[in-house]
């Protein structure tokens, strides 16, 4: 358990994961299994074995496992048996065991696996027989036919063992003892669930006489031509070798290793993430044929530019963990393919394999579908940060061999993939000589691909400058030529060196819960400063594990839900895709902001800007439509020329008839002209919109409050009042309106680990801001979640005027809400003035009014922004139109309930009952031209706040409508920058103007 080395025994040298016709036997399926509470043979493992069972007896062929359970391979044992085999545990930074490397706790769950496999007679003539494990967490010991074969380490790294001479024709026994904790656990602290077991495939391989041990076909591109450089590991009896690339007419025979030479290809289509052209190739020897797919591309750094095939790359990437709510990290190809197809549909062009090599088939898919890949080594020691990096293995000579072994296995397995454009040494492992040694090894082995590692702040051993969660001011200073501001952890000289390199954000716009906000600020910097090459969102998908309450209610579990003593809560729920595969509103925002084709719509035409790396717009058409008050009046397809990558054109519009009096919008969509491997024909890449005509006048009904008749009989239009308080709207019993300043805090509202911008300037602290409490903490301190009202005045002489003061116990700051009700024909008009008193010293989450409706209200139709939610710093995906949604689709079911569902700038809202229109609410602009937004939900903000999971929300007894004059922005402060000052909601007076009419 305490061995810091990479493993021992009959370990074979790492090599490529190849598609070959050599014989192989999969060992996936049911294995005999038992779970022990500790590791036999260790001081803490005394007594864990049955009486009279020897420590290593499990490996004996005569051992009786008939009473054991069955365990599927691949799988994690803690995800099987409904807790019978232990439970998952989640931590982000902290270790779930004492930090005393290389020691681990006595309580070390250990799984024993046994199965038999029948080996064909003809394998007796194989040159070698190999047992291959693609992934086992964390340390494991292997026996075959009673013979100890070796020890493996490196949970997400392939390991092969030579079992030649041990395996025999007929039935063979394979035994694996897997320990959850080992010294390796200290270097695998990767912000994910700790999930032990054999979770990737196991194979028995027959290596044929005259076979190909390894091959690396380096295929580069320049000036329209390609070049293939072959590196082949094979014995003399494997020759002659024949390389065939049918698509290029190549058939080359090498009679010996000495004859292997580069092949020049005079004309070839290059590979890129946008045009992933692959050429099928085979390399055949006397005993084996290996199949590969070649992608011709050249990666280089020229000054501070990162180039592929001579063109600057902008990474619109995501960090991708391997996670599934039922299988954990066990691979499923159909799910993985859909995962990557969804990425393409949402304009993701790059993947960082956080924080380990993925299943090798994922990289085949990345080659095929087209992604720039940062392939990361299986390495993270983040837990040492909590002890000031004392004892960090990254600078400990005792760990050097293990570090080098990990990077060798990473590079060697995946070196043939054209999608990989950067090797990453790992993540959040501090810095030290072992990391520098890893980098030196990579540079020697693969001089073309650059080396990445974010923790190398000073740039001593890496080729690109990388940061995570740098603020907008910091990022701007990194991109600015001649800036003298010191960079994080750098001297002036080191800062200058880092500014001479390409810069990328290996993690940014943290996507936890509702957010992230202000993605466009980063994208604007990438447009302005060529040194900035984009980044990778943290992260792609929530890691929720499917669980059920004792009553059988399904939910997605996060840290602490399995009784962990040490955990990091719902920090594992920080993806742009929810655990069930639902894209979040933040992902739609991202898609629009990073769109590879940008549309700027004007009254006289459309500017089509092709921001792609190399692909033209030949695969697109540009569909336009004109909508008056949200209803289509004309549509067509632009007569647009093909736009080359990096170019822009202005396309004139056909003559458009715009009638006065309504609100008329022109919308243009860039859509796929034909189906692809990842989307159907008509899929929308990006959208542009322009206001052609605004309403000519302020609605006449807004003047009704000036000449309201007396309130007689308790009625004004569709409103009915009781004792000076609203009781019914269009026959619907209601409660309200009341002032609402509270929203259920988002994960970003709760964030305090990064500086705050409410009390400090974002440019303070070298552009990183200054420490501050979370926004949610300040809101609670201000009592915004517990406001109570006191009616100050009720006047029914002209309509109904009602003034209420809202404030919290033990606090003097308040909010005055004046309601002025009047009648307009058969409709009711409401003007609400919201005026803060003195004494407020914080931003507000929202400023609006809440009206509780009957639970029979089940949806909404609206004219305004949509179809998804929007907030002040998350508006780019919103467009103006007419939309419809059922109640449950108006909010987002985040794993931890929080604010969601706000639709800004609503003009008209119709609430539905049993799917039919019931109450129409029109909104008018205030004196500053601002429209309110709305949220319609099943629960109050206070009820949502109190729930840790969706199933903890109380049974709904109402529909809760909040009309907001304003909302606070989202930011990404759960792990990143606070809400930018422009999008903060400071206490201020606002007016809301509404008209209510019976509908249907």
Model-derived regions: residue spans:
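Accessory beta-strand-rich segments of carbohydrate-active enzymes
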Residues: 2-19, 32-38, 54, 68, ...
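Substrate-binding/catalytic cleft of secreted carbohydrate-active enzymes
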Residues: 340-343, 350-576
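Accessory carbohydrate-binding/adhesion or oligomerization-edge regions at the termini
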Residues: 1-92, 177, 523, 530, ...
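Beta-strand-rich binding/interaction modules
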Residues: 142-144, 225-254, 261, 281, ...
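An acidic-aromatic loop/edge-strand motif
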Residues: 16, 79, 84-87, 92-103, ...
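Substrate-binding clefts and catalytic carboxylate motifs of secreted carbohydrate-active enzymes
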Residues: 23-28, 32-43, 72-73, 78-80, ...
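Beta-strand/loop-rich accessory regions of lumenal/periplasmic or secreted enzymes
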Residues: 180, 272, 654-662, 674-676, ...
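Active-site-adjacent substrate/metal-binding segments within catalytic domains
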Residues: 75-119, 123-133, 137-143, 150, ...
């Amino acid at each position: 358990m305490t061995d810091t080395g990479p493993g021992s025994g009959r370990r074979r040298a790492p090599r490529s994961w190849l598609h070959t016709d050599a014989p192989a036997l999969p060992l996936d399926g049911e294995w005999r299994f038992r779970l022990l509470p500790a590791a036999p043979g260790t001081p803490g493992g005394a007594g864990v074995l049955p009486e009279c069972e020897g420590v290593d007896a499990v490996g004996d062929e005569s051992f009786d496992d008939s009473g054991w359970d069955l365990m599927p391979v691949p799988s994690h044992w803690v995800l099987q048996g409904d807790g019978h085999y232990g439970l998952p545990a989640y931590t982000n930074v902290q270790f779930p065991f004492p930090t005393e490397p290389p020691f681990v706790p006595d309580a070390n769950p250990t799984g024993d696996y046994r199965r038999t496999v029948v080996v064909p007679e003809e394998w007796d003539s194989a040159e070698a027989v190999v047992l291959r494990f693609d992934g086992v967490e964390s340390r494991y010991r292997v026996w075959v036919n009673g013979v100890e074969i070796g020890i493996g380490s490196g949970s997400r790294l392939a390991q092969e063992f030579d079992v030649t001479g041990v395996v025999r024709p007929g039935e063979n026994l394979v035994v694996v003892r897997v320990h959850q904790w080992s010294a390796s656990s200290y270097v695998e602290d990767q912000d994910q669930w700790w999930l032990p077991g054999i979770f990737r495939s196991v194979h028995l391989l027959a290596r044929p006489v005259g076979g190909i041990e390894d091959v690396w076909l380096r295929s580069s591109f320049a000036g329209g031509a390609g070049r293939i450089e072959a590196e082949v590991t094979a014995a003399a009896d494997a020759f002659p070798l024949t390389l065939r690339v049918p698509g290029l007419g190549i058939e080359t025979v090498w009679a010996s290793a000495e004859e292997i030479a580069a092949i020049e290809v005079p004309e070839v289509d290059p590979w890129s993430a946008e045009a992933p052209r692959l050429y099928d190739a085979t390399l055949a020897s006397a005993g084996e044929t290996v199949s590969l797919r070649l992608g011709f591309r050249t990666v280089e750094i020229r000054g501070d530019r990162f180039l592929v095939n001579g063109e600057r790359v902008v990474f619109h990437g995501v960090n991708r963990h391997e996670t599934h709510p039922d299988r954990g990290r066990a691979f499923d190809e159909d799910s993985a393919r859909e995962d990557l197809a969804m990425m393409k549909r949402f304009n993701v062009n790059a993947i960082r394999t956080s924080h380990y090599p993925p299943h090798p088939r994922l990289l085949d898919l990345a080659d095929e579908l087209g992604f720039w890949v940062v392939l990361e080594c299986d390495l993270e020691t983040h837990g040492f940060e909590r002890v000031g990096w004392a004892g960090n293995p990254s600078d400990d000579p005792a760990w050097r061999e293990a570090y080098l072994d990990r990077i060798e296995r990473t590079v060697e397995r995946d070196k043939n993939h054209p999608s990989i454009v950067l090797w990453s040494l790992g993540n959040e492992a501090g810095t030290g000589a072992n990391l520098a040694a890893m980098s030196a090894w990579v540079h020697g082995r693969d001089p073309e691909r650059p080396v990445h590692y974010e923790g190398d702040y000073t740039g001593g051993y890496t080729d690109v400058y990388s940061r995570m969660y740098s603020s907008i001011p910091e990022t701007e200073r990194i991109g600015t030529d001649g800036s003298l501001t010191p960079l994080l952890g750098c001297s002036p000289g080191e800062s200058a060196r880092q500014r001479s390199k390409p810069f990328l954000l290996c993690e940014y716009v943290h996507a936890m819960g509702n957010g992230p906000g202000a993605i466009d600020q980063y994208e604007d910097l990438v447009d302005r400063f060529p040194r900035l090459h984009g980044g990778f969102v943290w992260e792609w998908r929530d890691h929720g594990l499917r669980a059920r309450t004792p009553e059988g209610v399904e939910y997605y579990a996060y840290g602490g839900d399995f009784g962990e003593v040490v955990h990091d809560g719902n920090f594992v729920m920080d993806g742009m895709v929810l655990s069930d595969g639902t894209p979040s509103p933040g992902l739609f925002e991202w898609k629009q902001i990073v769109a590879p084709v940008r549309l700027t719509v004007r009254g006289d035409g459309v500017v089509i800007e092709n921001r792609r790396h190399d692909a033209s717009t030949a695969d697109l058409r540009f569909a336009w439509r004109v909508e008056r008050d949200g209803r289509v009046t004309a549509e067509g397809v632009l007569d647009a020329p093909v736009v080359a990558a990096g170019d822009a054109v202005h396309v004139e519009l056909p003559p458009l008839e715009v009638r006065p009096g309504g609100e008329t919008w022109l919308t243009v969509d860039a859509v796929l002209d034909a189906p692809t491997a990842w989307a159907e024909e008509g899929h929308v890449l990006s959208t542009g919109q322009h206001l052609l005509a605004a309403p000519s006048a302020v609605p006449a009904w807004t003047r009704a409050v000036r000449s309201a008749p007396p309130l007689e009989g308790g009625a004004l239009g569709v409103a009915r009042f009781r004792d000076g308080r609203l009781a019914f709207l269009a026959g619907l019993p209601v409660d309200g309106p009341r002032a609402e300043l509270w929203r259920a805090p988002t994960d970003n509202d709760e964030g305090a680990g990064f500086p705050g911008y409410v009390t400090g300037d974002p440019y303070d602290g070298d552009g990183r801001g200054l420490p501050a409490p979370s926004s949610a903490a300040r809101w609670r301190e201000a009592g915004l979640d517990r406001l109570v009202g006191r009616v100050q005045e009720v006047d029914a002489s002209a309509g109904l005027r009602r003034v209420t003061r809202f404030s919290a116990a033990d606090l003097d700051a308040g909010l005055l809400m004046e309601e002025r009700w009047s009648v307009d024909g058969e409709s009711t008009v409401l003007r609400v003035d919201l005026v803060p008193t003195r004494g407020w010293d914080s931003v507000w989450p929202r400023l609006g009014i809440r009206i509780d409706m009957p639970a029979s209200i089940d949806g909404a139709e609206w004219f305004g922004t949509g179809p998804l939610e929007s907030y002040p710093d998350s508006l780019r995906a919103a467009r103006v139109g007419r939309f419809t949604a059922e109640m449950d689709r108006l909010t987002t079911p985040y794993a931890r309930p929080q604010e969601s569902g706000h639709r800004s700038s609503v003009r008209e809202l119709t609430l539905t009952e049993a799917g039919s229109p019931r109450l129409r609410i029109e909104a008018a602009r205030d004196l500053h031209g601002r429209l309110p937004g709305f949220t319609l939900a099943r629960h109050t903000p206070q009820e949502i706040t109190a729930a840790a999971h969706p199933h903890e929300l109380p049974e709904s007894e109402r529909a809760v409508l909040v009309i907001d004059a304003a909302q606070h922005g989202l930011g990404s402060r759960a792990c990143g920058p606070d809400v930018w000052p422009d999008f903060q909601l400071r206490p201020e007076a606002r007016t809301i103007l509404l008209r209510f009419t019976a509908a249907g």
